């Protein structure tokens, strides 16, 4: 189960970093390097990173400016900043309150569903860019959804440091394992060996729709759990990524 969780969680969270880069890319041609931080402050998540992680904030800023100056392509910049922001968000999810954790994943799934409406191939590329090459979600998602996504990121990270900060217990972990087992069994019974495509998307060529459907169905079942249970399962999943 662990490998499956790692794969599913990673692919559904990377879009936030792509959105971050696209916003930066829109500004870089019009913004002197010394003003870049001021411009990015319009992004809620960037403000939180600046408040909570000043060293990381400056490192990312320096890296983006250096890569931009060197004329590096978009994907190079994404690949550089992606793991740093992903690691931070995975860590924050462990301490964010239940409602923020569930909202964070709910909007992730809204993004995935919206992109699948464009095409199954676009959905697959969105989830698994390393297999067939990624897509630019800004070309497919409306501004409202992207704005809500970035705000959810910021709210979650800030709440993880707030008065309702959550502490994961061994009992929560055990309960999450118990809660997720019937979900995975239901999917395995329905999809048979195809469920392995969640772990090995490189074998899903020609089954792009199926892959996207399975990812969304699994998370839909998790999100249908009571909020406390759903949050516990999500925290369990992302703990495998940290």
Task: Describe the predicted segments one by one.
Residues 64-67, 89, 93, 131, ...:
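Generic structural signal for hydrophobic core residues of well-folded globular domains
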Residues 20-131:
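N-terminal Sec/ER secretory leader and immediately downstream segment
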Residues 89-120, 142-146, 188, 192-193, ...:
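Residues that cap or delimit alpha-helices
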Residues 1-4:
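Positively charged n-region of N-terminal signal peptides that target proteins for export
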Residues 7-23:
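Hydrophobic membrane-insertion alpha-helices, especially the h-region
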Residues 194-242:
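A cross-kingdom marker for long, charged
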Residues 117-203:
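Extended amphipathic alpha-helical interaction segments
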Residues 37-40, 50, 57, 61-68, ...:
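Residue-level detector of alpha-helical secondary structure
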